[in-house]
Amino acid sequence: MATTLATDVRLSIAHQTRFALRLASTISSNPKSAASNAAFSPVSLYSALSLLAAGAGSATRDQLVATLGTGKVEGLHALAEQVVQFVLADASSTGGSACRFANGVFVDASLLLKPSFQEIAVCKYKAETQSVDFQTKAAEVTTQVNSWVEKVTSGRIKDILPPGSIDNTTKLVLANALYFKGAWTEQFDSYGTKNDYFYLLDGSSVQTPFMSSMDDQYLLSSDGLKVLKLPYKQGGDNRQFFMYILLPEAPGGLSSLAEKLSAEPDFLERHIPRQRVALRQFKLPKFKISFGIEASDLLKCLGLQLPFGDEADFSEMVDSLMPQGLRVSSVFHQAFVEVNEQGTEAAASTAIKMVLQQARPPSVMDFIADHPFLFLVREDISGVVLFMGHVVNPLLSS
Protein backbone atom coordinates (compact mmCIF):
# COMPACT_ATOMS: atom_id res chain seq x y z
CA MET A 1 0.00 0.00 0.00
CA ALA A 2 2.92 2.34 0.67
CA THR A 3 3.73 2.62 -3.03
CA THR A 4 0.13 2.86 -4.27
CA LEU A 5 -1.16 5.84 -2.32
CA ALA A 6 -1.48 8.77 -4.70
CA THR A 7 -0.14 12.18 -3.72
CA ASP A 8 -3.64 13.66 -3.36
CA VAL A 9 -4.67 10.78 -1.06
CA ARG A 10 -1.58 11.30 1.10
CA LEU A 11 -2.47 14.98 1.32
CA SER A 12 -6.03 14.07 2.33
CA ILE A 13 -4.63 11.79 5.07
CA ALA A 14 -2.59 14.73 6.37
CA HIS A 15 -5.81 16.77 6.46
CA GLN A 16 -7.57 13.94 8.32
CA THR A 17 -4.80 13.91 10.91
CA ARG A 18 -5.06 17.69 11.30
CA PHE A 19 -8.83 17.36 11.79
CA ALA A 20 -8.20 14.67 14.43
CA LEU A 21 -5.77 16.85 16.35
CA ARG A 22 -8.07 19.90 16.23
CA LEU A 23 -10.95 17.79 17.50
CA ALA A 24 -8.79 16.29 20.27
CA SER A 25 -7.83 19.79 21.39
CA THR A 26 -11.49 20.87 21.41
CA ILE A 27 -12.47 17.83 23.47
CA SER A 28 -9.57 18.34 25.90
CA SER A 29 -10.51 21.99 26.42
CA ASN A 30 -14.14 21.14 27.18
CA PRO A 31 -14.51 21.16 30.99
CA LYS A 32 -16.84 18.16 31.01
CA SER A 33 -14.77 15.83 28.80
CA ALA A 34 -11.44 17.12 30.17
CA ALA A 35 -12.40 15.87 33.63
CA SER A 36 -12.99 12.31 32.43
CA ASN A 37 -11.32 9.80 30.16
CA ALA A 38 -12.20 10.38 26.52
CA ALA A 39 -11.91 8.47 23.27
CA PHE A 40 -13.09 9.09 19.74
CA SER A 41 -12.44 7.82 16.24
CA PRO A 42 -11.22 10.48 13.80
CA VAL A 43 -11.60 8.13 10.84
CA SER A 44 -15.23 7.36 11.79
CA LEU A 45 -16.23 11.02 12.15
CA TYR A 46 -14.23 12.08 9.09
CA SER A 47 -15.81 9.38 6.95
CA ALA A 48 -19.35 10.29 8.06
CA LEU A 49 -18.79 13.98 7.33
CA SER A 50 -17.16 13.16 3.98
CA LEU A 51 -20.21 11.13 2.95
CA LEU A 52 -22.38 14.04 4.09
CA ALA A 53 -20.35 16.31 1.80
CA ALA A 54 -21.16 14.04 -1.13
CA GLY A 55 -24.80 15.09 -0.80
CA ALA A 56 -24.14 18.76 -0.11
CA GLY A 57 -24.30 21.64 -2.55
CA SER A 58 -22.87 25.15 -2.88
CA ALA A 59 -21.74 26.83 0.36
CA THR A 60 -22.63 23.85 2.57
CA ARG A 61 -20.32 21.61 0.58
CA ASP A 62 -17.58 24.23 0.62
CA GLN A 63 -17.79 24.58 4.41
CA LEU A 64 -17.65 20.82 4.94
CA VAL A 65 -14.62 20.59 2.66
CA ALA A 66 -12.94 23.51 4.46
CA THR A 67 -13.61 22.04 7.91
CA LEU A 68 -12.26 18.65 6.86
CA GLY A 69 -9.25 20.47 5.47
CA THR A 70 -9.06 19.25 1.91
CA GLY A 71 -9.26 21.41 -1.21
CA LYS A 72 -11.85 19.40 -3.16
CA VAL A 73 -14.70 17.08 -2.27
CA GLU A 74 -13.21 14.50 -4.64
CA GLY A 75 -10.22 14.21 -2.30
CA LEU A 76 -12.54 13.16 0.52
CA HIS A 77 -14.03 10.37 -1.56
CA ALA A 78 -10.64 9.17 -2.80
CA LEU A 79 -9.43 8.94 0.80
CA ALA A 80 -12.58 7.09 1.87
CA GLU A 81 -12.08 4.54 -0.88
CA GLN A 82 -8.48 3.88 0.21
CA VAL A 83 -9.44 3.68 3.90
CA VAL A 84 -12.32 1.26 3.32
CA GLN A 85 -10.50 -1.01 0.87
CA PHE A 86 -6.96 -1.04 2.26
CA VAL A 87 -6.28 0.69 5.57
CA LEU A 88 -9.17 -0.96 7.43
CA ALA A 89 -9.12 -4.31 5.62
CA ASP A 90 -9.29 -7.28 7.99
CA ALA A 91 -5.96 -9.05 8.56
CA SER A 92 -6.95 -11.47 11.32
CA SER A 93 -6.76 -14.49 9.00
CA THR A 94 -3.03 -13.84 8.44
CA GLY A 95 -2.17 -13.14 12.08
CA GLY A 96 -2.63 -9.37 11.97
CA SER A 97 -5.18 -7.01 13.46
CA ALA A 98 -8.90 -7.61 13.13
CA CYS A 99 -10.57 -4.66 11.38
CA ARG A 100 -14.15 -4.07 10.33
CA PHE A 101 -15.60 -0.84 8.95
CA ALA A 102 -19.09 -0.38 7.53
CA ASN A 103 -21.11 2.59 6.27
CA GLY A 104 -24.88 2.75 6.08
CA VAL A 105 -27.46 5.15 4.62
CA PHE A 106 -30.97 4.78 6.04
CA VAL A 107 -33.45 6.94 4.12
CA ASP A 108 -37.17 7.40 4.69
CA ALA A 109 -39.42 5.72 2.14
CA SER A 110 -40.88 9.12 1.20
CA LEU A 111 -37.54 10.14 -0.30
CA LEU A 112 -35.33 8.77 -3.06
CA LEU A 113 -31.56 9.03 -3.00
CA LYS A 114 -30.14 10.79 -6.03
CA PRO A 115 -28.36 8.26 -8.28
CA SER A 116 -25.13 10.31 -8.19
CA PHE A 117 -25.07 10.30 -4.36
CA GLN A 118 -25.96 6.62 -4.18
CA GLU A 119 -23.16 5.74 -6.60
CA ILE A 120 -20.57 7.57 -4.46
CA ALA A 121 -21.94 6.03 -1.25
CA VAL A 122 -21.89 2.49 -2.63
CA CYS A 123 -18.74 2.59 -4.78
CA LYS A 124 -16.44 4.81 -2.69
CA TYR A 125 -17.72 4.19 0.85
CA LYS A 126 -19.03 0.62 0.33
CA ALA A 127 -22.19 1.78 2.07
CA GLU A 128 -25.38 -0.19 2.47
CA THR A 129 -28.41 1.88 1.47
CA GLN A 130 -31.79 1.00 2.96
CA SER A 131 -35.27 2.46 2.58
CA VAL A 132 -36.97 2.57 5.99
CA ASP A 133 -40.18 3.88 7.56
CA PHE A 134 -39.34 6.68 9.98
CA GLN A 135 -42.94 7.93 9.79
CA THR A 136 -44.68 5.04 11.57
CA LYS A 137 -41.86 2.74 12.69
CA ALA A 138 -39.23 5.07 14.18
CA ALA A 139 -38.60 2.83 17.20
CA GLU A 140 -38.12 -0.24 15.00
CA VAL A 141 -35.68 1.62 12.73
CA THR A 142 -33.73 2.81 15.79
CA THR A 143 -33.38 -0.82 16.88
CA GLN A 144 -32.38 -1.81 13.34
CA VAL A 145 -29.58 0.78 13.13
CA ASN A 146 -28.36 0.04 16.66
CA SER A 147 -28.30 -3.71 15.97
CA TRP A 148 -26.34 -3.15 12.75
CA VAL A 149 -23.72 -1.10 14.64
CA GLU A 150 -23.62 -3.60 17.51
CA LYS A 151 -22.92 -6.46 15.10
CA VAL A 152 -20.07 -4.67 13.30
CA THR A 153 -18.46 -3.62 16.61
CA SER A 154 -18.75 -7.08 18.23
CA GLY A 155 -21.16 -5.74 20.82
CA ARG A 156 -18.94 -2.89 22.02
CA ILE A 157 -21.25 -0.10 20.73
CA LYS A 158 -24.86 -0.98 21.54
CA ASP A 159 -26.96 2.19 21.30
CA ILE A 160 -25.41 4.70 18.89
CA LEU A 161 -28.92 6.15 18.51
CA PRO A 162 -30.19 6.99 22.02
CA PRO A 163 -33.79 6.12 22.94
CA GLY A 164 -36.16 8.73 21.52
CA SER A 165 -33.55 10.30 19.23
CA ILE A 166 -35.33 9.07 16.09
CA ASP A 167 -38.96 10.05 15.44
CA ASN A 168 -41.33 10.75 12.57
CA THR A 169 -39.49 13.99 11.74
CA THR A 170 -36.34 12.02 10.83
CA LYS A 171 -35.75 11.75 7.11
CA LEU A 172 -32.30 10.23 6.81
CA VAL A 173 -29.53 8.72 8.96
CA LEU A 174 -25.92 8.35 7.83
CA ALA A 175 -24.11 5.88 10.07
CA ASN A 176 -20.85 3.98 10.24
CA ALA A 177 -19.24 1.48 12.57
CA LEU A 178 -15.58 0.61 13.17
CA TYR A 179 -14.03 -2.31 15.05
CA PHE A 180 -10.32 -2.91 15.74
CA LYS A 181 -8.59 -5.61 17.75
CA GLY A 182 -4.82 -5.90 17.71
CA ALA A 183 -2.40 -8.02 19.72
CA TRP A 184 0.91 -6.52 20.83
CA THR A 185 3.96 -7.81 18.97
CA GLU A 186 5.46 -8.30 22.43
CA GLN A 187 2.71 -9.00 24.93
CA PHE A 188 3.06 -8.03 28.57
CA ASP A 189 3.36 -10.71 31.23
CA SER A 190 0.28 -10.48 33.45
CA TYR A 191 2.38 -11.67 36.39
CA GLY A 192 4.31 -8.41 36.12
CA THR A 193 1.16 -6.29 36.42
CA LYS A 194 1.13 -4.59 39.83
CA ASN A 195 -0.92 -1.87 41.50
CA ASP A 196 0.78 1.50 41.80
CA TYR A 197 -0.18 5.15 42.15
CA PHE A 198 -1.58 7.21 39.27
CA TYR A 199 -1.60 10.95 39.95
CA LEU A 200 -4.74 12.83 38.92
CA LEU A 201 -5.08 16.37 37.59
CA ASP A 202 -6.29 17.66 40.98
CA GLY A 203 -3.14 16.39 42.71
CA SER A 204 -4.75 13.38 44.36
CA SER A 205 -3.86 9.80 43.45
CA VAL A 206 -5.48 6.41 42.90
CA GLN A 207 -4.05 2.91 42.85
CA THR A 208 -4.46 1.14 39.53
CA PRO A 209 -2.91 -1.89 37.75
CA PHE A 210 0.25 -1.03 35.79
CA MET A 211 1.76 -3.29 33.14
CA SER A 212 5.55 -3.57 33.15
CA SER A 213 8.25 -4.86 30.83
CA MET A 214 12.01 -5.33 30.67
CA ASP A 215 12.06 -5.16 26.85
CA ASP A 216 13.58 -2.30 24.88
CA GLN A 217 10.86 0.03 23.61
CA TYR A 218 10.37 2.59 20.84
CA LEU A 219 10.66 5.78 22.88
CA LEU A 220 11.49 9.43 22.27
CA SER A 221 12.01 12.15 24.86
CA SER A 222 11.90 15.75 23.62
CA ASP A 223 10.28 19.12 24.33
CA GLY A 224 8.99 18.11 27.76
CA LEU A 225 7.29 15.06 26.32
CA LYS A 226 7.86 11.31 26.15
CA VAL A 227 6.34 9.40 23.25
CA LEU A 228 6.01 5.62 23.39
CA LYS A 229 5.26 3.54 20.27
CA LEU A 230 3.86 0.04 20.81
CA PRO A 231 3.60 -2.17 17.70
CA TYR A 232 0.77 -4.58 16.98
CA LYS A 233 1.32 -7.93 15.29
CA GLN A 234 1.54 -7.54 11.53
CA GLY A 235 -0.51 -9.62 9.10
CA GLY A 236 0.25 -10.71 5.57
CA ASP A 237 0.43 -7.20 4.10
CA ASN A 238 2.63 -4.17 4.68
CA ARG A 239 0.28 -2.27 7.00
CA GLN A 240 1.78 -1.38 10.38
CA PHE A 241 -0.52 -0.52 13.29
CA PHE A 242 0.87 1.15 16.41
CA MET A 243 -0.45 2.63 19.62
CA TYR A 244 1.18 5.90 20.65
CA ILE A 245 1.24 7.11 24.24
CA LEU A 246 2.07 10.83 24.57
CA LEU A 247 3.10 11.51 28.16
CA PRO A 248 3.81 15.14 29.16
CA GLU A 249 6.57 15.45 31.75
CA ALA A 250 4.42 17.89 33.72
CA PRO A 251 1.64 16.01 35.55
CA GLY A 252 -0.85 18.73 34.55
CA GLY A 253 0.41 19.16 30.99
CA LEU A 254 -2.39 17.34 29.17
CA SER A 255 -4.34 20.37 27.88
CA SER A 256 -1.25 22.27 26.74
CA LEU A 257 -0.05 19.15 24.90
CA ALA A 258 -3.40 18.89 23.09
CA GLU A 259 -3.18 22.57 22.13
CA LYS A 260 0.36 22.11 20.81
CA LEU A 261 -0.69 19.11 18.72
CA SER A 262 -3.50 21.15 17.19
CA ALA A 263 -1.39 24.27 16.58
CA GLU A 264 1.54 22.43 14.99
CA PRO A 265 0.27 19.99 12.34
CA ASP A 266 3.65 18.27 11.98
CA PHE A 267 4.20 17.95 15.76
CA LEU A 268 3.14 14.30 15.87
CA GLU A 269 5.26 13.31 12.87
CA ARG A 270 8.30 15.07 14.36
CA HIS A 271 7.93 13.17 17.64
CA ILE A 272 7.52 9.63 16.37
CA PRO A 273 10.14 7.31 17.94
CA ARG A 274 12.39 5.73 15.31
CA GLN A 275 14.55 3.47 17.48
CA ARG A 276 14.30 1.20 20.48
CA VAL A 277 15.98 2.20 23.73
CA ALA A 278 16.77 0.32 26.93
CA LEU A 279 14.59 1.21 29.91
CA ARG A 280 15.31 1.18 33.61
CA GLN A 281 11.60 1.20 34.41
CA PHE A 282 8.51 0.77 32.27
CA LYS A 283 4.99 1.23 33.66
CA LEU A 284 1.83 1.67 31.62
CA PRO A 285 -1.64 1.49 33.21
CA LYS A 286 -4.33 -0.79 31.87
CA PHE A 287 -7.40 1.19 30.89
CA LYS A 288 -10.88 0.78 29.43
CA ILE A 289 -12.87 3.73 28.08
CA SER A 290 -16.46 4.01 26.90
CA PHE A 291 -17.14 7.54 25.66
CA GLY A 292 -20.14 9.03 23.89
CA ILE A 293 -20.86 12.55 22.69
CA GLU A 294 -23.39 14.49 20.67
CA ALA A 295 -20.77 16.16 18.51
CA SER A 296 -22.72 18.99 16.88
CA ASP A 297 -21.37 21.71 19.19
CA LEU A 298 -17.79 20.42 18.85
CA LEU A 299 -18.06 20.54 15.07
CA LYS A 300 -19.53 24.05 15.22
CA CYS A 301 -16.47 25.08 17.26
CA LEU A 302 -14.36 23.90 14.32
CA GLY A 303 -16.29 26.21 12.00
CA LEU A 304 -18.92 23.80 10.66
CA GLN A 305 -22.15 25.82 10.94
CA LEU A 306 -24.17 25.66 7.71
CA PRO A 307 -25.21 21.95 7.75
CA PHE A 308 -27.10 22.50 11.02
CA GLY A 309 -29.15 25.53 9.97
CA ASP A 310 -31.99 26.44 7.67
CA GLU A 311 -29.45 27.58 5.06
CA ALA A 312 -28.15 24.01 4.67
CA ASP A 313 -28.04 22.71 1.10
CA PHE A 314 -28.23 18.92 0.69
CA SER A 315 -29.83 19.08 -2.73
CA GLU A 316 -27.31 16.55 -4.10
CA MET A 317 -28.47 13.83 -1.67
CA VAL A 318 -32.16 13.20 -2.34
CA ASP A 319 -34.82 13.81 -4.97
CA SER A 320 -37.68 15.56 -3.24
CA LEU A 321 -40.86 17.39 -4.18
CA MET A 322 -41.03 18.99 -0.74
CA PRO A 323 -40.27 22.73 -0.51
CA GLN A 324 -38.03 22.26 2.53
CA GLY A 325 -34.54 20.87 2.25
CA LEU A 326 -32.63 18.71 4.71
CA ARG A 327 -30.45 19.83 7.57
CA VAL A 328 -28.36 17.98 10.16
CA SER A 329 -30.03 17.87 13.57
CA SER A 330 -27.68 15.55 15.50
CA VAL A 331 -24.25 13.91 15.23
CA PHE A 332 -23.96 10.99 17.64
CA HIS A 333 -20.53 9.47 18.23
CA GLN A 334 -19.42 6.67 20.55
CA ALA A 335 -16.06 5.00 21.06
CA PHE A 336 -14.72 2.14 23.14
CA VAL A 337 -11.02 1.46 23.81
CA GLU A 338 -9.52 -1.22 26.06
CA VAL A 339 -5.78 -1.67 26.60
CA ASN A 340 -4.41 -4.67 28.50
CA GLU A 341 -1.51 -7.15 28.53
CA GLN A 342 -2.60 -8.83 25.29
CA GLY A 343 -3.26 -5.77 23.13
CA THR A 344 -6.04 -3.34 22.25
CA GLU A 345 -9.71 -3.73 21.44
CA ALA A 346 -11.47 -0.64 20.12
CA ALA A 347 -14.73 0.26 18.44
CA ALA A 348 -16.52 3.40 17.31
CA SER A 349 -19.63 4.58 15.54
CA THR A 350 -20.94 7.85 14.14
CA ALA A 351 -24.56 8.55 13.21
CA ILE A 352 -25.73 11.76 11.55
CA LYS A 353 -29.47 12.41 11.85
CA MET A 354 -31.06 14.63 9.23
CA VAL A 355 -34.48 16.31 9.39
CA LEU A 356 -36.35 18.84 7.36
CA GLN A 357 -35.22 22.38 7.78
CA GLN A 358 -36.38 24.71 9.84
CA ALA A 359 15.99 15.16 20.17
CA ARG A 360 18.15 11.94 20.22
CA PRO A 361 17.35 9.82 23.33
CA PRO A 362 19.89 8.79 25.98
CA SER A 363 20.95 5.14 26.12
CA VAL A 364 18.81 4.32 29.16
CA MET A 365 15.45 5.90 30.01
CA ASP A 366 12.35 5.47 32.15
CA PHE A 367 8.76 5.42 30.95
CA ILE A 368 6.31 5.66 33.83
CA ALA A 369 2.83 6.75 32.71
CA ASP A 370 1.63 7.62 36.21
CA HIS A 371 -0.22 10.81 35.28
CA PRO A 372 -2.67 11.92 32.53
CA PHE A 373 -1.64 11.22 28.93
CA LEU A 374 -2.89 11.22 25.35
CA PHE A 375 -3.09 8.09 23.22
CA LEU A 376 -3.82 7.23 19.62
CA VAL A 377 -3.96 4.17 17.35
CA ARG A 378 -2.49 4.80 13.91
CA GLU A 379 -1.68 2.86 10.77
CA ASP A 380 1.81 4.15 10.05
CA ILE A 381 2.25 3.35 6.36
CA SER A 382 -0.72 5.56 5.44
CA GLY A 383 -0.74 7.74 8.57
CA VAL A 384 -4.49 7.24 9.15
CA VAL A 385 -5.50 7.78 12.80
CA LEU A 386 -8.16 5.24 13.84
CA PHE A 387 -8.65 6.19 17.49
CA MET A 388 -7.53 9.00 19.78
CA GLY A 389 -8.22 10.09 23.32
CA HIS A 390 -6.87 10.87 26.76
CA VAL A 391 -6.66 9.09 30.11
CA VAL A 392 -7.01 11.16 33.28
CA ASN A 393 -7.94 8.26 35.59
CA PRO A 394 -7.41 4.62 34.51
CA LEU A 395 -10.02 3.43 37.01
CA LEU A 396 -12.84 5.25 35.18
CA SER A 397 -14.41 3.22 32.39
CA SER A 398 -17.12 5.64 31.24
Curated annotation (Swiss-Prot):
Keywords: Protease inhibitor, Serine protease inhibitor. One of its GO terms (molecular function) is serine-type endopeptidase inhibitor activity. Residues 343-367 are annotated as: RCL. It comes from the Eukaryota. Pfam families: Serpin. One of its GO terms (cellular component) is extracellular space. The record marks Q357, Q358 as: Reactive bond. The keyword Methyltransferase does not apply. Inhibits chymotrypsin and cathepsin G in vitro. The reactive center loop (RCL) extends out from the body of the protein and directs binding to the target protease. The protease cleaves the serpin at the reactive site within the RCL, establishing a covalent linkage between the carboxyl group of the serpin reactive site and the serine hydroxyl of the protease. The resulting inactive serpin-protease complex is highly stable. Belongs to the serpin family. This is Serpin-Z1A. The gene is WZCI.
